[in-house]
UniProtKB/Swiss-Prot annotation:
Signal peptide: none
Family annotation (SUPFAM superfamilies): Ribosomal protein L20
CC per GO annotation: ribonucleoprotein complex; ribosome
Native species: Shigella dysenteriae serotype 1 (strain Sd197)
Keyword terms: Ribonucleoprotein, Ribosomal protein, RNA-binding, rRNA-binding
Descriptive protein name: Large ribosomal subunit protein bL20
């Protein structure tokens, strides 16, 4: 049976991992064994954080809507309930944007929600 020489394949694999680890600190960007572990861990963090980003943005939007709603004398939960009863279908991302950049329009939405609750 012929001898299998894997030098070219190994070098290619090592170069690929070291390229992915470019910019990492110390041995993580220079030593293959350490870089491989760092790249694997980075992938795990990226996978986890792609899901967490969605949760974190929703939390941020809710916090902004709550703050703006309370300035207008209504809690977040009552505000959202009022909008649902008034059949206003604006998602939290847009509501948060309106709360930050267009106070007049947000106040109008609050009044609409209060009217639907009364």
């Amino acid at each position: 049976m012929a001898r299998v020489k894997r030098g070219v394949i190994a070098r290619t694999r090592h170069k690929k991992i070291l390229k992915q680890a470019k910019g990492y600190y110390g041995a993580r960007s220079r030593v293959y064994r350490v870089a491989f572990q760092a790249v694997i861990k980075a992938g795990q963090y990226a996978y986890r954080d792609r899901r967490q980003r969605k949760r974190q943005f929703r939390q941020l939007w809710i916090a902004r809507i709550n703050a703006a709603a309370r300035q207008n004398g209504i809690s977040y939960s009552k505000f959202i309930n009022g909008l649902k009863k008034a059949s206003v279908e604006i998602d939290r991302k847009i509501l948060a944007d309106i709360a930050v950049f267009d106070k007049v329009a947000f106040t109008a939405l609050v009044e609409k929600a209060k009217a639907a609750l009364a």
